[in-house]
């Protein structure tokens, strides 16, 4: 009888693993986060300046109308992107926030709400997960304690470039080729800096967008070199746009940002018409991995973009 029970238990475990795997859309997800990347930046750029972004759009699913939460500032919106909550629920309401002005509706035990990194680690303990960023606040709001690898490096100081986007991107490509991560987030802060220093849609801003596109091409090649490209979903997202030399207001130039998804089981050439909010990003990543989401998350996955 004990042998029968053990066999049944083993079958149940295998079935549970198979069911979990069946829910996944891809084994690997790479999210490229671009700070200050306005939808208008894509509209204004010649296709020849952003060939990799255009390729992912033409062969993936996308919108240029993802809406930022208010106010349209970086920390507030990356927080929503990571933890599936609007401003009034996560409580991060000021520029450069690393904690909430009011208590969040939930806590991961590390002083912030559960993020996509938190729940992926809880539900898939064996995953390889990393994040590289050039703005230190990303480390404070993402839950680095859930990651295998996280690395911060400053790439700019005002108008001074300390490390080029091409050099910075090598940190991402090296990690991808060495570790073949299940989930990897790579954050570019240089475009937001270009907007503040020279103005959104200025020649310098557009040139920076062009250099980030080159970086995206290098990341795509690294995924191929690592042998995981065919089982990867690439997401490109942004926190806010901009106007003149700033953001934080309530104009559509500041609030509308791109969201591009390409890869395994993703529809090609599909501009989806449904509304999308910043906090839907976390829910969409959770859906790709087949994860259960926290009860208080308000984000919903963009299921319509998948085959």
What are these regions (language model features)?
Residues 4-13:
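Sec-dependent N-terminal signal peptides
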Residues 8-9, 18-57, 128, 179, ...:
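…; additionally, a secondary subgroup of soluble metalloenzymes is captured
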Residues 23-26, 39-122:
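Active-site nucleophile/metal-coordination loop of metallo-enzymes that catalyze phosphate/sulfate
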Residues 26-39, 56, 81, 120, ...:
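Beta-strand elements within well-structured catalytic alpha/beta cores of enzymes
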Residues 31, 52, 208-252, 285:
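Metal-dependent active-site segment of extracytoplasmic phospho-/sulfohydrolases and closely related
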